[in-house]
Amino acid sequence: MDIFFQSKKLEKIASDPRKCLKELGQTRAELFQKRLRDLYRADTLEDVRYLPGRYHELSENRKGQWACDLDQPYRLIFEPHEDPIPTDENGKYVWIEIKGV
């Protein structure tokens, strides 16, 4: 899956293990790197749906965003790169058609 970052700072944290460890601490950095690896290895968002980390859609004011757990209470929040986000006839998001975040 293609991953794009909202800021250069976040991209640097994701690509530099030492900076990631310094910014996030050991436990959160390990989980952050693992979740990113899961996303990189996936072809679509559906591939990570049932992996550890509880990947899930958000609602209310965060509708159109997804999250996965890091260490409590932290989570990684991301948005699909597709615009508009693919939906079915019932208005539910089609995870298998999302190929970038």
Where are these regions (language model features)?
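Short, contiguous, well-ordered secondary-structure segments
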Residues: 38-42
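Generic alpha-helix structural propensity
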Residues: 31-34, 53, 69
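Short, surface-exposed charged micro-motifs
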Residues: 2, 57, 67, 77
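A short, surface-exposed loop/turn module that caps and links secondary-structure elements
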Residues: 43-66
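Pocket-edge structural micro-motifs
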Residues: 7, 59, 70
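Residue-level signal for secondary-structure boundary elements
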Residues: 18, 22, 44-48, 70
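Arg/Lys-rich, positively charged N-terminal/basic patches that mediate binding to nucleic acids
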Residues: 1-37
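Enriched for short, Lys/Arg-rich terminal
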Residues: 68-101
